[in-house]
Amino acid sequence: MLATLKTYPATLNLLLCASLVLTLARAVTLPYLVIYLSSNFDLGIADIGLVIGSTLIIGSLLSLYGGFLVDRMHSYPLILTCCAVFTLAFLGAYGASQLWLFYLCLVLVNLAYAVIDIAVKSGFGSLLPVDQRSEAFSIKYTLTNIGYAIGPFLGAGVASLDISLPFLLSAGLGAGYFLIYCVWGDKNLATVETGQPPTPFLAVGKVLLRDYRLVCFTLGGLLSAVVFGQFTAYLSQYLVVTTTPGTTYRIISTVVATNALMVISLQYSLGKRISRRHLNAWLAAGLSLFIVGLSGFALSTTLVVWVIAMAIFTLGEIIVFPAEYMFIDSIAPNHLRGMYYAAQNLGNIGAALGPVLCGLVLATQPAQYIFYMLMLFIVAGGLFYWLGGRIASDRNLEPLK
C-alpha cells in the first residue's frame, strides 16, 4: 500500500489524508458519547440512542445538498469550509452546556464529515483512471479503519484526565488538517464540468430518482448497512441480554480487535482485486459471507467461535465496502458524481436503525431472532443490488456481471 501511495500525486494523498485524520478525530469522541450524554445531560439510554442516531440521520440527509455543492464548486474552498465547520463544531460541543447546542454541534460534525467524504470520493474520479479506483477506495477504507482503531485509545487517554477533553483533541486534529490543506491543497481541483449548464438542486434530485440503478443501489446499501453499519452495537445488546457484563466486555473487545486487525491487514490486498466487470459476483460473495458470519454469531457459545464468526463476517465487510463504491462509480455521470455519492451516504440511515431494530426484537422475541432478522436484511439488500446491476442505464452501459 505504501508503494502505491508513493506513486499517487500529492493532491490525491492529501485527500486520503483527510480520511485518516478526520476519521481519527471522530473516533476519539464517538465511543464516549454515551457516557458524556449520560453524565453531563442526565439522559437515559433510550434518549441517548435517539440523540446519536438522529444526528447521524440528519447529517446524512443534509449531505445530499453537500453532494450538490461538490458538483458545483471547486473542492479546495469546499473542503476548507467543511473542515472549519468540523473543527468549530467540536469546539462548540466542548463548551456546550445545553443539550440543543450539543445536538446541533453533533449534526454539524456528521454533516461536515460526510461532505468531505463525498469530495474525497469524487476526487478519485477526477484524478484516477477507472481501473485504478477500486485500489484507491480500498486504501481509503483501510485508512478509515486505522483511524477508528487508534481513535478510541487516544480518547481514553485524554478522557481519563477530563471527560470533555476528547472534544478538544478532535478539534485540534480538524484544525491541523485545515492548516495542511490550506497550505498544500490543490486550489484547482474540481469535479465540475464547465460545459454543463447550472441545474437547480431539486431538478438534479428528480434526475437521480429517475435513475433506477441508483435507487436500487441506494436501497440495497441502506438495507445492508443495518447489518454492518454498527455491528458492535447490536452484538453488545445481544450479549448484555444473553451473558454477564464481564463476558460481554471480553467478547466485544476481542471481536472488535479481530475486525480491526483483519480490515487493516487484508483490505488493500483483497479490495484492489475487485473489478467493475464482476461486481455482482463480488457483492454476492461478500453478502454470503455476512450471512455465514451472522449464523456463526447465533450459534456461538465460546470465544473461539465468536472470533471465527467475526473473521468470516469481516471478510464480507472487506469485499462489500469497495464493491459498493465501485457500483456507484460505474453509474455516476462525471457532472453528478458528488450527488451520486451523497445518495450512497443515505446508507447511514440503515446503520442508525440497526441497533434500534435489534433492541425491539430483543425486547419482544428470543435473542437469536435478531440474527435471523439481520439475514433477511442482507437478502433484501442483495436483491436490490442484483436488480440495479441488471438494469441497463440511460448511458448505454452493459448490465453489471
Where does each model-flagged region fall?
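Short amphipathic helix-loop junctions that connect adjacent transmembrane helices
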Residues: Y32-A46, A233-I252
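Residue-level signature of mid-helix packing/kink "hotspots" within the transmembrane helices
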Residues: L56-L64, Y148-A149, A260-Y268, A351-V356
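Structural signature of the two symmetry-related core transmembrane helices
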Residues: P77-L91, A281-G296
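Symmetry-related core transmembrane helices of the 12-TM Major Facilitator Superfamily/SLC fold
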Residues: P166-C182, F371-L387
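A late C-terminal transmembrane helix in Major Facilitator Superfamily
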Residues: H335-T364
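Juxtamembrane intracellular "pre-TM" segments in multi-pass secondary transporters
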Residues: M1-P9, N188-F217
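Cytoplasmic helix-loop-helix junction between adjacent transmembrane helices
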Residues: V107-I146
